[in-house]
Amino acid sequence: MPLFTTLSIIHNAGIIHRGISPENIIVTTDCELKLTGFCISSIRTSNTGLSPEFYSGYTAPEQYSSLEWQGTWTDVYALAAVLYRILTGCMPLDAYTRTKNDTMVEACRVNPRIPQHISRVLSRAMRVRGEERIQTVSELVTALFEQHTTHMEHPKGSTQTIPIQ
């Protein structure tokens, strides 16, 4: 959760990271996660001849166009893509490719042990159109961790253990 908290704090300060990827998440010897590479894209492009750095599979679609707005939803896309990679073991499809032909496979289809609820949240957080995406890290956290009291999803073939009284 510290990574989610860090992103919420920087977003509340008006800062968008624009480069979240496994390469920019460092695990310390104390097993803490550190996010690096802040604002690299804005530094690289402001009054220079440099192009922004894109992270295939993690860069949000709107980052490929100078005409589209970027915001907290841009980082939500990248964070969800990192979670997708962790949970499935597969690289997410490149967003630029997805804008032309979206063939992204849901996480639960890649790894059947992923609950459908989590898979749906990741799909919503990685929608191609920014306005259709989960907008903030706090919304992402709420969606990922909300409890389903009326219907708990269990993987096929699983059984429920009921304590003996």
Predicted regions and their residues:
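Regulatory extensions appended to serine/threonine kinase catalytic cores
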Residues: 151-165
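C-terminal lobe helix-coil module of Hanks-type protein kinase domains
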Residues: 57-149, 153
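Canonical protein kinase catalytic loop motif
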Residues: 16, 21-22, 26
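Activation loop
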Residues: 48-57
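Conserved protein kinase catalytic core
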Residues: 43-45, 91
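Protein kinase catalytic-loop region centered on the HRD/HxD motif
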Residues: 3-15
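Conserved protein kinase catalytic/activation segment
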Residues: 24-37
